[in-house]
Regions:
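Extended alpha-helical assembly domains of large eukaryotic scaffold proteins
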Residues: 1-154
Length: 154
């Protein structure tokens, strides 16, 4: 019988996990990292490969909820800083932080994606969002764009 709490076994599982991750065997690497009690690394291999759904599943299954959300939010922020807004959005939405995704697009000046997310996740705020954007654009002298939002609120 193999004892799970043996540090040498956990260390070997870590090494094997890194090896299998490096050759693209994410499923096996994930199992080894979980066995080594390193759920965060298991989540990271899925994030690195762009498998946001699996990263979220592993985090939810093997980490405390707040810890999982914190790890995924940290990666979303990193993706956002690197300009990978769609990937960051996927992570924010996966952890239920729709407002962070909306704010990210607002900060980036990407109004169409911001409005899309408001419509999907905060429909009660859609009209208010259009009004605010219309006033903001009108004040900036962008009458044509403002008009689209004035019309979008009806």
């Amino acid at each position: 019988m193999i004892e799970d709490d043996n540090p040498e076994i956990r260390q070997q599982c870590e090494k094997l996990g890194e090896y299998f991750s490096s050759i693209g065997e994410r499923s096996l690497a994930e199992s080894l990292f979980i066995r080594a009690e390193n759920a965060q690394r298991a989540v990271e291999i899925h994030i690195q490969s762009g498998d946001w759904i699996r990263a979220h599943q592993v985090a939810q299954e093997h980490m405390k909820s707040d810890e999982a959300n914190q790890v995924l939010a940290k990666h979303a922020e990193s993706l956002q800083q690197n300009g990978e807004l769609r990937h960051a959005e996927s992570l924010y939405v996966a952890i239920g932080d729709h407002d962070a995704a909306i704010a990210m697009y607002r900060k980036a000046g990407n109004r169409s994606d911001m409005v899309r997310l408001v419509a999907q996740h905060r429909p009660d705020l859609l009209q208010t969002t259009h009004q605010h954007l219309a006033r903001e654009l009108d004040a900036a002298g962008k009458a044509r764009e403002a008009e689209e939002h004035f019309l979008g609120q009806f």
